[in-house]
């Protein structure tokens, strides 16, 4: 599976480079993000995943000079049959993403610390499925930002949103609304503490964009969104004819950072 993943990254790199080359030249600092979603079913799989992330994956990525990696679990895990864990990793380029994912496979410390996960038997896998989403940061939010929060990790609410559009052209309109239209600056003014805003360049629900905002707790989250929908600037922006019907479906996932997560 790892070999197939590297081939996918290589192909993606070639295609995305051609598609994004002009944009990248104008915005050389825009990051790429890899978001992995692990589906698991029980505490045994969760333990293997946590051990692998904490003692193998994050240290290996840190040795590759990736400073901040986010590891989160879905708040709904307590009652959900399909439980979820997320790993968010920022990269300077698709080439770096491909190279780092390749290099850690030759890291002896990584292979030793992650052996239970890496060498799992076919009938005792550490997860049921794994999704990989590749994202490209928005021009107005070219680099990830660390949340400025004071609450304990088990109280925080990280809100991951995915906005799907009906067609590529309509999707481009929604991306324009976030950037030139002023939606990103509005979120910043209202202190939504966003980690990233991005367009998905490889994933299962395209065309779509994804972004993550963070809050001290659920009560603060509710208060922030109430302020947002009542804001005069949002009312004006959302009523503009050119921005109508540019989102077809929204997925909202509430997450909490694991204690060993970098943010």
What do the PLM-derived regions correspond to, one by one?
Residues 21-110, 115-116, 120-234, 244-263:
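Short S/T/G/P-rich N-terminal loop/turn motif that feeds into the first structured element of a domain
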């Amino acid at each position: 599976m790892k070999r197939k993943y590297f081939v996918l990254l290589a192909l993606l790199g070639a295609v995305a480079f051609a598609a994004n080359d002009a944009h990248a030249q104008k915005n050389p600092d825009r990051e790429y993000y890899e978001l992995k979603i692990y589906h698991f079913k029980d505490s045994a799989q969760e333990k293997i995943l946590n051990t692998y992330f904490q003692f193998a994956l994050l240290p290996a990525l840190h040795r590759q000079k990736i400073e901040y990696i986010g590891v989160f679990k879905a708040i709904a895990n307590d009652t959900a049959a399909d439980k979820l864990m997320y790993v968010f990793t920022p990269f300077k380029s698709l080439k770096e993403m491909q190279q780092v994912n390749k290099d850690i496979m030759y890291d002896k410390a990584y292979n030793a610390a992650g052996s239970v996960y890496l060498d799992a038997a076919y009938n005792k896998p550490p997860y049921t499925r794994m999704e990989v989403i590749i994202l490209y940061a928005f021009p107005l939010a070219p680099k990830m930002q660390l949340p400025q929060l004071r609450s304990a990790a088990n109280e925080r609410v990280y809100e991951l949103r995915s906005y799907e559009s009906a067609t590529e052209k309509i999707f481009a309109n929604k991306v324009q609304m976030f950037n030139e239209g002023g939606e990103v600056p509005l979120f910043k003014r209202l202190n939504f503490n966003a980690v990233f805003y991005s367009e998905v360049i490889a994933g299962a629900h395209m065309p779509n964009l994804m972004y993550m905002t963070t809050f001290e707790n659920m009560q603060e989250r509710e208060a922030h969104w109430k302020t947002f929908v009542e804001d005069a600037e949002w009312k004006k922006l959302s009523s503009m004819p050119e921005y109508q019907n540019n989102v077809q479906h929204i997925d909202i996932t509430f997450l909490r950072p694991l204690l060993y997560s970098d943010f």
